[in-house]
């Protein structure tokens, strides 16, 4: 995923958290807000452990989001918040992201 798709500014995060809507799955909470482009941010708190663990979780979330990027049909700012637990896997994040994107109607499957 290129840097063009990353939500980086504090102002953007605040607007998504204040004005956005939320969807919930087993291991992820998704906060989203309509925008002019597709961007994703990741909010991993210190409750998840040290910096190594937090960065691993963010890498897994980024990779999961990257796999759905071609299928997203609408422009939104997304913020993914993982729930605190012991272990995380890429397959679990992908499964939960697919559920959230289908529940929110974000996927545009061209088949």
Describe the predicted segments one by one.
Residues 1-111:
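Positively charged, solvent-exposed patches that mediate nucleic-acid binding
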